[in-house]
Amino acid sequence: LKDGSNDTIEEAHWASDYRMLGSVLNNEPQGLMARLEVEVPGWRSAEPGQFALLQAGSSRCFLARAVSVADEVGARVSFLIAPVGEGTRELCALNGGDMVWVVGPLGRGFDVDALVISRGRAVIVAGGAGVAPFPLLLARMARRHRALFSRPVGEGPGGPQASTLEVLVLLGFRDALQAEASTLLREVAALACESGLRCRVEVAIEDGLRGPAEKVTDLLIRHLRSGDRVAVCGPTPMAEAVWSICASKPDVRAWFSLETGMACGVGSCHGCLITLADGSDARVCKDGPVFLGEAVFGG
């Protein structure tokens, strides 16, 4: 895609033309983050890992903010938001009945089938605010697993030996307050267990005030095994360390939702451009935010 092409102009117009006006249903703190639930008329179902552009109806900010879709039930969409700047602070301060401009869902998400249809185990690795996309991913994995493996033997992929999917969720936080952001994910994990997934959640807290001082990478080193399929989201240094661990094991595939600043959200401004391992450029908002680990970090 070249700068100044008609495609970039059309993408920018699409973002402005397809804004939806949502109404805040609930906004509750979860540690250092806010769980914002919005009713969005016209919302199209999101893939896990996709995001939306959000802007408070009365915002003083020029640009909307890119926020991962954390969960959805029809037009009721939940977001986990960290107040890191003026725009996100405005979103975290909204009350029931306030209005929000929404564009989305946008981007490319996780490959649910690759995580579910596998001889290995599914592993979710999240650091800090990187927990945000995983409630929806876990819910969709449970739904897809039921659809595939609740059929009689011979009518679909898998069989008796694939009737239970093991999912290991590894979470890392600076302290116990930040760890409260995992509340929604834990709720979804409990429901996933009831639906037939064998789901286990482990949490590493770095400050060591309520147990051993550990990072999420310590948990991954302890538990990762050959054949695992891994979904990752977190700060770049954590993602790089996770990839190094994954690359050290045979037959491990990992998908990374990259944390990077976005402006337009539709690929027209090239503000989130990254260079991939093969030397080509990619727009995180359009070509991602989810990429295979080897594409980003190299083989």
What are these regions (language model features)?
Residues V40, E206, D287:
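Active-site donor-binding loop signature of nucleotide-sugar glycosyltransferases
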Residues G57-C61, G104-G109, D278:
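Short, charged beta-turn/beta-strand-edge "cap" motif at the junction between a beta-strand
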Residues G293-G299:
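A charged, well-structured terminal subsegment
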Residues K2-D98, F173-R174:
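Ferredoxin-reductase
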Residues T236-P237, E259-V290:
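Local cysteine-cluster metal-coordination motifs and their immediate loop/turn environment
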Residues R89-G261:
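FNR/FR-type flavoprotein reductase catalytic core
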Residues L21, A46-G49, A66, F134, ...:
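A general structural signal for well-ordered alpha-helical segments in protein cores
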